[in-house]
Amino acid sequence: MKLIGITGMPGSGKSAITKLAEKYKIIVVSMGDVVRHETSKQGLTLNPENVGNTAVKLREIHGNEAIAVPCLNYVNEKYKNEDFVIIEGIRSIYEVNYLGKNAKLDIIAIHSSPKTRFERLSGRNREDDSNDWNTFVERDERELNFSIGNVISLADYMVVNEGNYMDFINNLENTLKKIIKAD
């Protein structure tokens, strides 16, 4: 099995991979779902502060691989016979190292400017998103503290999502095809 990791700052367009994955019959597992599940399990409201604090606490208690370990265990239990599995939402270099030690891994980074991402998040209406600029900046700082900047800069592929949505989807699909073809 080969893992295709998707990384990018909140609102960059990481979830767009889901539609492409359906087209190519590739399973998508979201690392963010692991954190949101743990937040809910603790009886906390899903909002940027609680979800972010849960991610920090999980890493403090269980180490820097705290999200990657249960995510990969889940993939190995449920999807071990798949040729490809997409792991959406990789945040830290420790997660990359852990996943790369335990499976073949390529990373796609999706990049959008802060202004573009804020506009998207303000209109997305997901419980853990915010339409407040200061909360948005705090979330970005928390993500950067996880070392997501290192993951983005060391990614195998970079797709920019700043303009036309269909151009972005075409570029993302071409990148996905390169990875599939190379394997």
Curated annotation (Swiss-Prot):
Pfam families tied to this protein: AAA_17
List GO molecular-function terms, semicolon-separated.
Answer: ATP binding
List residues binding ATP: 8-15
Which InterPro entries does the protein's record reference?
NTP_hydrolase-rel, P-loop_NTPase
Q: Does the keyword Nucleotide-binding apply?
A: yes
UniProt key word Nucleotide-binding: yes
Supply the alphabetized keyword list. ATP-binding, Nucleotide-binding
Q: Which family does it belong to?
A: Belongs to the UPF0200 family.
Name it.
Answer: UPF0200 protein MmarC5_0311
